[in-house]
Amino acid sequence: MLATSDLWFRYQNEPVLKGLNMDFSLSPVTGLVGANGCGKSTLFMNLSGLLRPQKGAVLWQGKPLDYSKRGLLALRQQVATVFQDPEQQIFYTDIDSDIAFSLRNLGVPEAEITRRVDEALTLVDAQHFRHQPIQCLSHGQKKRVAIAGALVLQARYLLLDEPTAGLDPAGRTQMIAIIRRIVAQGNHVIISSHDIDLIYEISDAVYVLRQGQILTHGAPGEVFACTEAMEHAGLTQPWLVKLHTQLGLPLCKTETEFFHRMQKCAFREAS
């Protein structure tokens, strides 16, 4: 399990995270939302062991995180982060070598590396461009390479920072499909994003942060339907939730579900 217990973190004398109690093992996809400066990025760095809290703990497998070199190495094989900018974690000019980089550092046999790289590229739908030079890839393709680089570690938790930032509508739809495939393999995904519609559609649970504290958390439909909480957090409601709260239309999880239900209603009225 990956969780936090009364987690506090400050930069110099300025508290950034204030007593966070969170459990990311309870839901396949957990969304983190909040205005700029609410602590999302700092939380990610604490979860991955890049930062160490001054009080409280990150809990891994039910125990406080071990910050020794061996402990952090073990954590990062199970909890992998994919940054908003894929350029921050792509080091090679060819895709296969870049994805295999961490496995070779760990001494994984070449046959196993080949198998894992091939599986990861298939999962992120990158087989058709795997032989292109990385510098020729689009931003969205580089994001998929970065995700594949995390997947080859067979991590059980994937931390995605703004996975749809900079993507066109087709790329955004493809990213949602990739996340669903990752979860279908039994993994957990934690998403930090300003794309409120993405978080609503794909998350099973949501934490809303405000000034380093948990303002509210729960099921996406319940959390985002609370207009007062959204305003307090400096957020807007997902458009599907707005249709429900402001117009009284049925609360739907996806655009496809919404239009399907509207078409059924129109058909009934016409008949």
UniProtKB/Swiss-Prot annotation:
Enzyme class: translocase
Binding site for ATP: 34-41
Main location: membrane
Domain ABC transporter: 2-236
Cellular component, GO, one term: ATP-binding cassette (ABC) transporter complex
Keywords from the named record: ATP-binding, Cell inner membrane, Cell membrane, Cobalamin biosynthesis, Cobalt, Cobalt transport, Ion transport, Membrane, Nucleotide-binding, Translocase, Transport
EC number(s) from the headed UniProt entry: 7.-.-.-
Pathway in which the depicted protein is active: Cofactor biosynthesis; adenosylcobalamin biosynthesis
InterPro entries per the UniProt record, alphabetical: AAA+_ATPase, ABC_transporter-like_ATP-bd, ABC_transporter-like_CS, ABC_transpr_CbiO/EcfA_su, Co_trans_ATP-bd, ECF_ABC_transporter_ATP-bd, P-loop_NTPase
Membrane-topology annotation of the record: Peripheral membrane protein
Subcellular location: Cell inner membrane
UniProt GO MF annotations: ATP binding; ATP hydrolysis activity; ATPase-coupled transmembrane transporter activity
Domain of life of the native organism: Bacteria
A Pfam family recorded for this sequence: ABC_tran
Family (UniProt): Belongs to the ABC transporter superfamily. Cobalt importer (TC 3.A.1.18.1) family.
Described function: Part of the energy-coupling factor (ECF) transporter complex CbiMNOQ involved in cobalt import. The complex confers cobalt uptake upon expression in E.coli; can also transport nickel with a very low affinity. Presumably responsible for energy coupling to the transport system.
Subunit and interaction comment: Forms an energy-coupling factor (ECF) transporter complex composed of an ATP-binding protein (A component, CbiO), a transmembrane protein (T component, CbiQ) and 2 possible substrate-capture proteins (S components, CbiM and CbiN) of unknown stoichimetry. Expression of just CbiMN in E.coli confers some cobalt uptake.
Annotated protein name in UniProt: Cobalt import ATP-binding protein CbiO
